[in-house]
Amino acid sequence: FGRVLSAKELPFAIKDGKLVETKHTPPVHWIYPLIFSDMSIGALSTRAWEAVALAVGYLNEKCGLPVRMSSGEGGMPVKLLESDYLKYFIIQIASGHFGWNRIIKAMPHMKTDPAGILIKIGQGAKPGDGGLLPEAKVAEHVQAIRGVPKATLASPPNHQGLYSIEESVQKMH
């Protein structure tokens, strides 16, 4: 509501020290989806990432809530790319370009389109520095998903070779 209505227009009021509804409001899933933001499979543990992914599928399929999850820049497991659940995921491409060869190879086998594609232009949390995934966290499955050797992985602060809007558009075609 805060993005659409001013504070005075919100359908809530405080009465006797409690927040009360002053008029009917639609359930949150009628308004917009809930999104689990960018968390790569390399940054989280595999089990944690897969647990969130399973929760996203469950909340959509069993509860009817429009929940989406962004893959983070580390790519996605092929079994998810080729599943019906891909429609709940936003595939991210970021400055490290990790996992994109695998995603491109999986495209002919995808049963559905992803919920979206997120193009991360720069590292917002670490502007000018980029990010590092320590070698210790680059397990075999991370190497397979990202198509990289076991080494510390650097994600540059921006897309190398993209210095203008025109260059960005050319890369997307």
Regions found by a protein language model. Give the residues of each.
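N-terminal capping/small domains of soluble enzymes
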Residues: 1-160, 167-172
